[in-house]
Amino acid sequence: MDIRRIVLYMALALIGLSLWNAWQIDYPAKQPVEEKTASQLTSDGHLLPQIIPSNAEQPVTLKAEEKASSGKQLIQVKTDILDVDIDLKNGDIVKGLLLDYPLSVEDKNKPFPLLQNQASQRYVANSSLFVLDGQTPQSLDFDFTSEKEYYELKPDQNQLIVTLNGKSEDGLDVKKEFVFTKGSYLIEVNYKIANIGNSLWKGYFNTQLLRSSPKEDKSSIFHIGSYTGASFSNPGKNRYQKVSFSDMSKSNLDVDAKGGWIAMQQHYFLSAWVPNADSENKFYTLATDKDYTIGAVSQPITVKPKEDKIVGSKLYIGPEITSVLKGISPSLDLTVDYGILWFLSSLLFSLMKAIYTVVGNWGWSIVLVTVLIKLAFYRLSATSYKSMASMRKLQPKLQALRERYGDDKAKISQATMELYKQEKVNPLGGCLPILIQIPVFIALYWVLLESVELRQAPFIFWINDLASADPYHVLPLIMGATMLIQQKLNPAPADPMQAKVMMFLPILFTGLFWNFPSGLVLYWIVNNTLSILQQWYITRKYSDEKPAKKVVATAK
């Protein structure tokens, strides 16, 4: 095996990685689910899961129930980083704008809409109380009222509490509170339940994320996709488990969990319900022809007459920032999907972030991290390039052996190994150093792909978004040129077919990287450039040394 084969294998590995991403999205691993059951879709958009009451031997039968429409009476709440709309019908958050994240480089004045309730795209965060009416779950309509239609967190405020007031027909006086905190994407949602009736009230607290037929970001050879779908964490069993939309269509998730969280993911952004760590819930998924839901329903809640009780959960709607997610709930940071080498990716991102705090530019941070990685692997790379230089000096002797023995491959192989032994050259010496570096490359690959910090982050000149492709495709062309220069430094392959394949590689990689994120292409350019300089120096150094003594290799 020589360095050319390693390059070929790396090319195949890159293509395989892209194909694997596409395969995982199209054919994800099966999740722990049960057979698909019935569900109830109320006219206000709530999908209620099947519940088995303690006094029932069979699962309840869910029936469709007509309810009056909400009329879409909304209130607006604005903080320093969030702008949300709350529907007074059930107190659902039906719009969530992220004020610090523009929609695109071209639309800097439009905030990114993570949650929205449009005809073309519905993505909302529901929370409700419901009871069992015989065998049928029935969502309680409180028709909430609010003191104001617009709430805003003032610059001198650290917290804003929005209270909705409502009453139910069965004797509940409910206050639904939303607690917003300055600089935070986490919202506390609490129900303060007062039983003003004369009988015991028994019901359930339900939270869910509902999304209508989202467009999934699928991978291909020429495009790197990112996971779009649901996920959950069940402490002690599943730290982080994806549930794709295709899984939801086939069968319903049904998992008992203590603590944990449920989430809807997409590239760079996340919504998640985080129950109290000591609360017990049933995590479920439901799917209709156009809607996909992941939810959590509590254990039965009882409130005696004239007594009060508070139930609630936390809702996160914002960017996938690992340092923030770590502080909210265990394993929530795993939604920043760094893949199987997440631990190594996390270390590399921490290094990138530390450099960014000094230089103030993510592009230069990528450049400097690449330099540090090359320095860390300098000796290994030097060993590889030294082996290549030695192999280059042996090319005339190897060619002479091929001419001497013609088509006798056995004698050529035997004579070649004897030559390596006499010249003290290890043909595998250039392979191991490169193989050791591959995990680092893969880990950094996922960091550059998944880190929201690179979204719309400028570098220099025309590169104004490291997470998007170079609009003029200059970087992929430069990257292809660096690969071509690297090939010129290597000895020409003796096999004509292999030589043609090697010449085609720069073209192949240029095509592969044509629409890749600029940050990823930048890494490859810097890495290739540093490799060229190191290889040129070492090759020149060993080429200038006194030539090895001529050794006549003979076949035994």
Curated annotation (Swiss-Prot):
Its main location: membrane. Keywords: Cell inner membrane, Cell membrane, Chaperone, Membrane, Protein transport, Transmembrane, Transmembrane helix, Transport. The keyword Membrane applies. GO terms for biological process: protein insertion into membrane; protein transport. Coiled coil: none annotated. The keyword Protein transport applies. HAMAP family: YidC_type1 (MF_01810). Belongs to the OXA1/ALB3/YidC family. Type 1 subfamily. Required for the insertion and/or proper folding and/or complex formation of integral membrane proteins into the membrane. Involved in integration of membrane proteins that insert both dependently and independently of the Sec translocase complex, as well as at least some lipoproteins. Aids folding of multispanning membrane proteins. This is Membrane protein insertase YidC. It comes from Legionella pneumophila (strain Lens). The gene is yidC.
